């Protein structure tokens, strides 16, 4: 079993302990997909990559990229902080989506912007901002995350 899958399985185990039945996992064709009911958070393990996302924005982590620990940190940052998603619309067409993590210090980190090339550029731009509350208190899972980061999975 590759390291990406071991990390996915360990995160799944921790989330099921903390969030119970809200954690939904689907396995299909050597891939696993996890989402949390009522949330935009998701992650998957396929093609030897751990993919962590919130809404449409996502990041790929892998042993090959030497960034698996960053994947663990990103996962728990998304779960333990407020998330801000800003959609930019022209008419009824969304042409850009930005996702940010808002940390307790009020600092924000842009974790991704997705833009679409075809949109009615002549129409007025509307900006819609949505706030998603943290799913887990950091203090409730911090010890387990530190252990996971320091493990030899």
Q: Where do the language-model regions lie?
A:
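Generic recognition of long tandem-repeat/solenoid scaffolds
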Residues: 30-36, 50-55, 95-102
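N-terminal "first-domain core" detector
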Residues: 1-37
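Intrinsically disordered, low-complexity regulatory segments enriched in Ser/Thr/Pro
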Residues: 38-70, 109-153
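Amphipathic protein-protein interaction modules
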Residues: 69-121
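Alpha-helix boundary/N-cap detector
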Residues: 2-6, 10, 63-66, 70-73
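Surface-exposed polar/charged interaction patches
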Residues: 14-21, 25, 78-81, 138, ...
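Short linear motifs in intrinsically disordered
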Residues: 22-25, 37-45, 83-93
